[in-house]
Amino acid sequence: MQILKDQENLNPDGGSFVLITPPLSPPKQKSLSYTNISRRHGMRACMKGIVYEVYKNQPKLWLQQELIWLRRKRIHPIPKARRNNHVGRWANRHSNVSSSSGSRGRSSVSSRDSSPSYSGALRSAERSISSSPSTIEARRRKSARGNGLNGAIDVANLPFEELPNFCPDMSVLDNRTHPRTLKAEWKGPPLDLSDDPYRDLLHPAELHLASTLRLPCLIYLDNKKRIFAEWHHRRQQGLTFRKTDAQRASRVDVNKASRLWKAFHEVGFFDD
């Protein structure tokens, strides 16, 4: 209770009086009101969520109530910065776990490899596998398929002067009864080879083919020589000469190498 003395107001007898007032009470906390929420009545049971409507009518009170509930449950809200980095943190944790597991796996493998018994057994197994006749024969077949020359000559990297000449005689194209000639299709206008200094080394059908593929005469002669050298050596190995083999042996675009292979193949130059 508070006791207040009023010195100015005097009673009729001339004496002062004492004013006694009740204590000040703190303001009561407002509670969320659900009276303004519309309800549906009907003959059947119906449930409707009103959380958003209550929040929309009294957002501040709703937030206070939620914070009180979180404090009671000892649940701390996640700050905004932590929410933004939540996915990245889980990704980093996953990468750390995978890297640690990988390092543990590597350490276990390295420790196992460092043991004398394991390393000795591994070396002996490798020697037995590498020295087996089937493995050696498989390696020979693979190398023969890879470059077509059993590792003896690398057609694609040899200079033009050192390449053996296995090109066929182009005079067979002069035969009027020959059903096919060198033909190819290419986008763009043909290349003018009228002033090429090496045009005399080409057959007229070859000039037409080189012009269509936009290849100068010297580049055409170089790639023709490489293609037929690769074909000859693959035939010696008993292997077929495919379009991809011509692409590996050539020094031009793979599409142009494919057109050259197709033109020579259709004429029958690759027939055994």
Curated annotation (Swiss-Prot):
What are its GO biological-process terms?
Answer: chromatin remodeling; regulation of transcription by RNA polymerase II; transcription initiation-coupled chromatin remodeling
Tell me where the signal peptide lies.
Answer: none
Spell out the InterPro entries in the cross-references. Homeodomain-like_sf (IPR009057), SWIRM (IPR007526), WH-like_DNA-bd_sf (IPR036388)
Does Cell wall biogenesis/degradation appear among the keywords? no
Q: Which Gene3D superfamilies match?
A: Winged helix-like DNA-binding domain superfamily/Winged helix DNA-binding domain
- Residues that the record marks as modified (Phosphoserine) are 130, 132
Show where the SWIRM domain sits. 182-272
- Tell me which domain of life the UniProt entry assigns to the organism this sequence originates from: Eukaryota
* Coiled-coil ranges per UniProt: none
Indicate yes or no for the key word Repressor. Answer: yes
Its Gene Ontology molecular function terms? chromatin binding; DNA binding; transcription coactivator activity
The cellular component terms of Gene Ontology attached to this UniProt record, alphabetical and capped at eight, are: nucleus; Rpd3L complex; Rpd3L-Expanded complex
Q: Which UniProt keywords apply?
A: Chromatin regulator, Nucleus, Phosphoprotein, Repressor, Transcription, Transcription regulation
**Composition skew (Low complexity), residue ranges:** 95-120, 127-136
What are the Phosphothreonine sites (modified residues) in this protein?
135
| Pfam families membership | SWIRM (PF04433)
Principal localisation: nucleus
> Where is it located?
Nucleus
| Disordered: annotated segments | 86-148
| Protein role | Component of the RPD3C(L) histone deacetylase complex (HDAC) responsible for the deacetylation of lysine residues on the N-terminal part of the core histones (H2A, H2B, H3 and H4). Histone deacetylation gives a tag for epigenetic repression and plays an important role in transcriptional regulation, cell cycle progression and developmental events.
Q: How does it assemble?
A: Component of the RPD3C(L) complex.
The name this protein carries in UniProt is: SWIRM domain-containing protein laf2
